[in-house]
Amino acid sequence: YYGNAVFREEIKSVQLFRAGAVLSHPIITLGTDEQLVLKFDDLSGELRNYSYTLIHCDADWNESFISQDEYIDGFIENPVDDYALSFNTTFSYVNYRIELPNDQMRFKRSGNYVLVVYEDQDKEKVVLSKRFYIYENAVRIEGTVRRATIDAFKGTNHEVDFKIHHPNLSILNPREEVKVVIMQLSLIH
């Protein structure tokens, strides 16, 4: 199970967002020029040898065990080589930045992903992990939101009714093949 986590006390201000929209959720469309940006600060003030990789996950954020070359085009592991040293501050820190996709690593497949940053090219020395989504418009969804129809939820919850139109996608067993996740996203751009 992978979550959003920081494993070192000196790592602060971790942000993962769509490029150009700092307050956005980390979601981009497969095959477009959209990018995600990960930023974090290392308050130790020392320049560290960080690397990163991507893990493709299932709907429950467990590793999908698909071979990395099936979902990554390019190098499987890369150094974090975009950084800036602090200046004119009361204490020293280093700000690190990763943009995805990039020239070294591109996505081949949509899905749930975890970006894992680790030290000294040692995947046992994990520094942080952040979840994000890559999606593709494979289906069309038609939906409505209304007040809950079950008495226990009236006044506090909503009901979402929807239909999935999938003319170019074969779904033989919807209970096994389809998982619906409803997220309330902000419209901040």
Residue positions per predicted region:
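Extended, solvent-exposed segments with strong compositional bias
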Residues: 72-93
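Short acidic/polar inter-strand loop motif in beta-rich domains
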Residues: 59-61, 105, 119-126
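Conserved small/polar residues in nucleotide/adenosyl-binding loops
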Residues: 189
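Contiguous beta-strand segments within globular domains
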Residues: 6-56, 152-168
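C-terminal edge beta-strand
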Residues: 129-133
